[in-house]
Every structure is written in C-alpha cells, then in structure tokens.
Amino acid sequence: MKKFLCLSLCIALLLAVLPSAAYAVETFTTSEEGIAFIKEFEDYRATPYEDNGKWYIGYGTLCEKGDYPNGISQDEAERLMRECVKVAEDLVNNLLLTYGIAVTQYQFDAMVDMAYNLGTQWMNPTYRFCSYLISGVGQYTEAQVVNAIATWCHQG
C-alpha cells in the first residue's frame, strides 16, 4: 500500500513541478483534498494493526501495540490523523522556508503525505530528493526525480 501511495506521490509531484520562480515562498496547511487523499489511501481501521513491525490505528496513525484496546471511532481517527498531519506540515514548512523553496499547494500536500507515511528522514539535505528540492527540481530530469522519490518508497 505504501509503495502504491509513494508512486502516486511521484506522479503528483511530477505533474505539478513548475519552475520555483513562478511561486512565492509561503507557509501552507494541507488542503482538504490532501486530507481526503490520505484518508482514502490509508483507509480507516478501528483497531490497532501491524505493518512492517510498527503499530498503527485509524488512518495510518502510529501508535503502540497496547494503545486503544477498545478501538477508536472514525471521528477520533481523523482527529489523530490531523494532529500528525499538523506535525508533518510544520516540518515541511520549515524545510521550505529554510531553503527558500517555493511550491504549489498540490506539491505541499504531496510532501506532507510523504512525511506522514514515510517519516521525515527524506528531509535531510544530504539525501538526493531533498537536495533536488533545495537546488530546484526543474534542474533534474523526471527520471532523476522519480528515482530519488522511489528510494523513499522502498523505506516504508
């Protein structure tokens, strides 16, 4: 599921990539379309489940194995997801502002989704995908960007 999601992110980023100069650097919040995207691909699970040795609940929110023994409602699942998305938003916004990276709402949503699903390790400037963002994705071929993102798709 995470590989499919990451492939979707690759497509989203590639379709939306425009020269950075076309946009002002600003802070964003995830759009309702971005939230719906996460919910659709994560799917709701009322009880904790294991995936790759980690435990999750609701819409893919990280938890501990013993958390939520009685499960959670969809409303609670969405609240938990939005709390985690807010953390991801702050981290992505910090990256963008620190390096003066201008993006579209669509690109921001994709990066928040990537941080939510795969973690934030990809935000390290020494890693290819982050270094491409910093120096301008437009300087690289689509194949190079896809390969840089694909590295992280195999992490989750």
Which residues fall in each region the model found?
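Active-site nucleophile-His-acid catalytic modules used for acyl/amide transfer and hydrolysis
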Residues: 87-126
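Positively charged n-region of N-terminal signal peptides that target proteins for export
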Residues: 1-4
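Sec-dependent signal peptide cleavage junction
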Residues: 17-26
